A protein has these predicted regions:
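Intrinsically disordered, low-complexity Ser/Thr-rich linker and spacer segments
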Residues: 19-28, 68, 79-104, 204-210
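Acidic, Ser/Thr/Pro/Gly-enriched interdomain connector segments
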Residues: 1-49, 88-93
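Catalytic cysteine-centered active-site loop
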Residues: 103-156
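Short acidic, glycine/serine/threonine-rich helix-capping segments at coil-helix boundaries
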Residues: 23-34, 38-83, 136, 172
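Short glycine/proline-centered loop/turn elements that form peptide/ligand docking sites
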Residues: 75-77, 153-154, 166
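Hydrophobic beta-strand signal
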Residues: 159-161, 179
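Aromatic- and glycine-rich peptidoglycan recognition patches
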Residues: 133, 139-149, 166, 173-210
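Extracytoplasmic/secreted envelope proteins and their assembly/folding machinery
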Residues: 33, 37, 59, 82, ...
Length: 210
């Protein structure tokens, strides 16, 4: 199975310049369009390259995003679409940035905070809580919370669950890698997903499935 490699760098550029840009629609070109495309790729709505040209694929992705988020699905990126998209991207960035900030923290069985150290599910629960998202405490319960996501739609910020029954969890970062607090004697670290027995994917933000 090949993982979708997501365009993470685009999300780091979204700021006031993007927020203040004019309407974007089919036929628009330039840096704002490229930024928009990068964020749609990041959120799983666009399976294409970010080339700065607002064509049919970008329009379809925008319509899909709007429809899924209770907006008028006109394919035009105005203030409402831009604001909702920005909020979702910033939320995902917050989750990933928080997770990365604990790289190197020692594993602690039963640990649920930076002060004590984390076990695997204590780590994921704490990271999501910092973004205002409440998830269960233990890995097997986390694996049945949120919304199930197929492997083909895996994106950054998703909870990745391992083994059967589920006994380990982490947070997907993109590019085939995830962050987790692995085991006693180890530390919070980034690991390639291909080395793990992935059995479930759950999503708690900006649900897009099917």
């Amino acid at each position: 199975m090949a993982l979708l490699c997501l365009a993470l760098p685009f999300t780091l550029l979204m700021g006031t310049a993007y927020a203040a840009s004019p309407l974007l629609r089919r036929g628009s070109r330039g840096a704002d369009v490229k930024q928009l495309q990068g964020n749609l790729i990041y959120l799983g709505y666009l399976n294409d390259v970010a080339d700065g040209i607002f064509g049919a694929k970008t329009e379809a992705a925008v319509r899909r995003y709007q429809s899924r988020n209770g907006l008028a699905a006109d394919g035009i990126v105005g203030a409402q679409t831009r604001a909702k998209l920005t909020k979702e991207v910033l939320l995902l960035n917050q989750i990933l940035d928080t997770a990365r900030s604990y790289l190197g923290l020692a594993y602690q069985s039963g640990g649920t905070s930076p002060q004590t150290g984390f076990d695997c599910s204590g780590f994921t629960q704490y990271v999501f809580a910092r973004a205002g998202i409440s998830i269960p405490r233990v890995s097997r319960d986390q694996a049945s919370a949120g919304v199930a996501v197929p492997y083909s739609q895996l994106r950054p910020g998703d909870l990745v669950c391992f083994n059967s029954p589920v006994s380990h969890v982490g947070i997907y970062l993109g590019g085939g890698k995830f962050i987790h607090s692995p085991k006693p004697g180890d530390r919070v670290k980034i690991t390639e997903l291909k080395y793990m027995d992935l059995t479930a994917i759950r999503r708690f933000t900006g649900v897009l499935v099917g």
